Amino acid sequence: MSKAFTRENEDADDVEDEDSPSLPALPAGTKNYITPAGYQRLKSEYLHLLNDERPALVQTVSWAASNGDRSENGDYIYGKKRLREIDRRLRFLAKRLENSQVVDPAQRGECEQVFFGATVKICHGDGVERTYSIVGDDEANASKGHI
């Protein structure tokens, strides 16, 4: 049998430098400032993956493994790959939640300063007004005005 198009190490996907390539890792000892809504979104994603998606996938992979030949079993191969992705995301979320410091902008009240969690209106010279919210890395989305 030819080994031309097979991987030498099936677990090659497990070894990665980062848990999530979408955001850089925080430097050691750095707090991850986040709004209460952002913290809740991260926590709900973590709990959904841990309690719903992962157990269902483990059951599917178990069933696929019991069908015999794993080398040509699409359900098994895809399931294992997806399981690695979920585990990677769970590790990333756990680190982010552990290093999070929730900052509630409502406790600051009205003031004339820009601070974390503030919503700022900017008026350009041509009269166009834009609204931006100052948020942490996990919530940043320039298209929605979250910077």
Q: Which residues are covered by each model-predicted region?
A:
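A short linear-motif detector with a strong N-terminal bias
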Residues: 27, 35, 42, 98-101, ...
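Residue-level signal for pocket-adjacent positions within structured domains
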Residues: 21, 29, 97-98, 129, ...
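Helix-rich terminal scaffold detector
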Residues: 1-91
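Structured, basic alpha/beta domains of bacterial-type, RNA-associated proteins
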Residues: 89-107
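Generic structural "secondary-structure junction" signal
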Residues: 36, 72, 99, 104-105, ...
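Non-DNA-binding regulatory cores of transcription-related proteins
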Residues: 103-147
